[in-house]
UniProtKB/Swiss-Prot annotation:
Entries under PROSITE patterns matching the protein: GATB (PS01234)
Enzyme class, UniProt record, top EC level: ligase
E.C. number(s) listed in UniProt: 6.3.5.-
Any one Gene Ontology BP term: translation
GO molecular function ontology, one term from the record: asparaginyl-tRNA synthase (glutamine-hydrolyzing) activity
Pfam families: GatB_N, GatB_Yqey
UniProt keyword terms in alphabetical order: ATP-binding, Ligase, Nucleotide-binding, Protein biosynthesis
Family: Belongs to the GatB/GatE family. GatB subfamily.
Name by which UniProt lists this protein: Aspartyl/glutamyl-tRNA(Asn/Gln) amidotransferase subunit B 2
Catalytic reaction(s) noted: L-glutamyl-tRNA(Gln) + L-glutamine + ATP + H2O = L-glutaminyl-tRNA(Gln) + L-glutamate + ADP + phosphate + H(+); L-aspartyl-tRNA(Asn) + L-glutamine + ATP + H2O = L-asparaginyl-tRNA(Asn) + L-glutamate + ADP + phosphate + 2 H(+)
Amino acid sequence: MSYETVIGLEVHAELSTKTKIFCNCSTKFGAKPNENTCPICMGLPGTLPVLNEEVVHLAVKAGEALHCKINKLNKMDRKNYFYPDLPKAYQISQFDIPICSGGYVEIPTKDGVKKVRLNRIHIEEDAGKLVHLEYEPHSLIDYNRVGVPLVEIVSEPDMRSPEEAVEFMKTLRAMLQYANISDCRMDQGSMRCDANISLREVGSTEYNTKVEIKNINSFRELQKALEKEEKRQKELYDFNEGFRIKQETRRWDSGKGKTVTMRTKEDANDYRYFPEPDIIPIVVKDELLEKVKEEMPELPVERKARFEDQYKLGSKEIEILIEDKALADYFEKLVEAGCESKTASNWILGDMLRLMRETETDSKAIPVPVEHMNQLIEMIKTKEISNTAAKEVFEEMFKTSKEPKVVVKEKGLSQISDESALQKMVEDVINNNEKSVLDYKAGKKQAIGYLVGQVMKQSKGKANPPMVKELLEKVLSE
């Protein structure tokens, strides 16, 4: 039987505020455990929450960027459940009247642009973080994250493959970053998602029972988790006639490469939602709506159009650059510093992106300052170093944040342009590569490429390639 995959995502994005949603505690990441807490966010008796105005501002901004209807009158609700990371034993969220309804995100697919509908955007407070110790019978709790404001962006089940889900996340991340709503640092947990997935017979319009997958913290893990769950459900249907998937919450175990059962999936009634009695309904005024529209910065679609007009780059290069605001910003700063746009793109999308992936470095934390990158490229242009040596220098710059001139001096990588020194290397290579020399003299001009490579190898990448080629041609023509 052929199946169609149905996927919907619930994306949590922490808002870029300096303080928490209901108190003055800092939201800064990386503090000592339980340092950024107070009686309010810990829910101690006698404390009352005060809604952070900037939270409403950023939530409205998210709704505007994502084409939502802004509900001018909305309210906060209590979501009741017990878990160690929730000190109040309830979470202040939004239930039946969220701040934003509807909306959509347009994603690229192999068949063109696809519109993925949104169900809603609502405001809520984040929970704490459980730290599970290996080989220990207990866990630790860090409450710093309790009360950090976030928006939950809920999609409709419009995605039909793990690849589409990843594109949705990438596009959404770019939108939120560009609008300065969230930094979306998945490595720090400021953007997370739960995935809902089910299968149905191709051609069917009915939805089957969905499974929710939690513990997904990167685009790569999202794709893997959905692919594995897709395969698991397909096998259950194929080998068990009349089988019905049970509604449950599963956790992605990246170590084992599979989803594992956490608990039976709850319904809204299980959470006993009721209006938050300590916070009055939220009224979104027309002045705020106007302010949000006026301050909306350049969004990814607009930046893409500008890049196509302003820079001589291919569409795929532009797509990768604008996908990540910090990366696109780095590119533009490098071009502003005097670097040619194609050269800047080649370095960023080549060696830089490779090292970022290998070291899991976030684009907001690139260890090579723009001015150092520009210096390196200038050193190649002025023939102070070869392209081969430049790659070695860049790797060291990425590891240490040192200036390129310092690395070149430490490693002795200055390009050899002294003709007498190169002449000796050229003669050595000619004397030791008789076959290639004879091939060249017999008319196989491509043989000179091999000889140039041998000189570069002998010089450990420091010889000036154009000078080497010129000297080889001169000697071989005598």
